[in-house]
């Protein structure tokens, strides 16, 4: 039995998220499993580094699978990409030892959320960014983003249906910056709660629109109640861009996405 790690890029527009759903509901995981199972000529189960909601994208989702099939790495990639839908692509594959696990060996995960701030919606970026037409106080939003760094109880910033046993997370960095008409939130943490990034972005957007002051974030944390925070930002602008592992696994580190933004590393 061989174990392989894979790096996957996908658009989440047509899928109900990463994780396999009930029959008849398209998921990224199930779509890839069906193709890999054909190539391996045996059932394949894919284990992802994380879960993404419906409509959320990824530029380097890490996953792993076990198989008895013997194929060259190029054969796996070319075979899979020739059969996968055009909105899913295997970017790399590497044979691993059985100690590796895409989810449980991950030490951190990283997301970017992209807002297009302009009067008119961008037709060619439909569902790839979140469009905000109102004028935003970007400098205020930049300062507010840093309030989420460090170790906090994120009860207020997780979905009511979140199944995690505990809401404390350590955020290594939470930075918002301008890139032309785009606003990009870059956030890395040891783990994320359901809707955590989208709720943080929703809070920042409301601050940018002058709905409350930066210090109100402290009161939100203290409340430990989802109702104390504002909107959940749409899934459209959210990208899973990286997953981090101990150096011993030596996984490929592709450029951070989304690639069409041409952002600095």
Curated annotation (Swiss-Prot):
Any one Gene Ontology BP term: tRNA pseudouridine synthesis
Active site (catalytic residues): 53
Taxonomic source organism: Acinetobacter baumannii (strain ACICU)
Name by which UniProt lists this protein: tRNA pseudouridine synthase A
SUPFAM superfamilies membership: Pseudouridine synthase
Organism classification: Bacteria, Pseudomonadati, Pseudomonadota, Gammaproteobacteria, Moraxellales
Gene behind this protein: truA
Catalyzed reactions per annotation: uridine(38/39/40) in tRNA = pseudouridine(38/39/40) in tRNA
Family to which this protein belongs: Belongs to the tRNA pseudouridine synthase TruA family.
Enzyme Commission no: 5.4.99.12
């Amino acid at each position: 039995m061989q174990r392989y790690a894979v790096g996957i890029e996908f658009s989440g527009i047509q899928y109900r998220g990463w994780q396999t759903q009930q029959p008849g509901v398209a998921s990224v995981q199930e779509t890839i499993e069906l193709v890999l199972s054909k190539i391996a000529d045996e059932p394949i189960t894919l284990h992802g580094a994380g879960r993404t909601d419906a409509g959320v994208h990824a530029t380097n989702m890490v996953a792993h699978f076990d198989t008895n099939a013997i194929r060259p790495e190029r054969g796996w990639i070319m075979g899979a990409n020739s059969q996968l839908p055009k909105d899913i692509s295997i970017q790399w594959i590497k044979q691993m030892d059985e100690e590796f696990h895409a989810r449980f060996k991950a030490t951190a995960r990283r997301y970017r959320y992209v807002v297009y701030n302009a009067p008119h919606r961008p037709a060619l970026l439909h569902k790839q960014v979140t469009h905000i037409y109102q004028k935003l106080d970007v400098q205020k939003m930049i300062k507010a983003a840093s309030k989420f760094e460090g170790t906090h109880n994120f009860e207020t910033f997780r979905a009511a249906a979140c199944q995690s046993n505990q809401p404390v997370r350590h955020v290594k960095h939470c930075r918002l910056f301008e890139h032309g008409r785009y606003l990009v939130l870059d956030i890395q943490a040891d783990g994320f709660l359901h809707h955590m990034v989208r709720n943080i972005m929703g809070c920042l957007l409301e601050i940018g629109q002058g709905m409350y002051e930066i210090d109100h974030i402290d009161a939100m944390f203290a409340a430990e109640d989802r109702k104390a925070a504002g909107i959940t930002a749409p899934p459209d602008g959210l990208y899973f861009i990286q997953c981090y592992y101990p150096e011993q696994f030596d996984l490929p580190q592709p450029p951070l996405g989304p690639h069409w933004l041409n952002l600095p590393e």
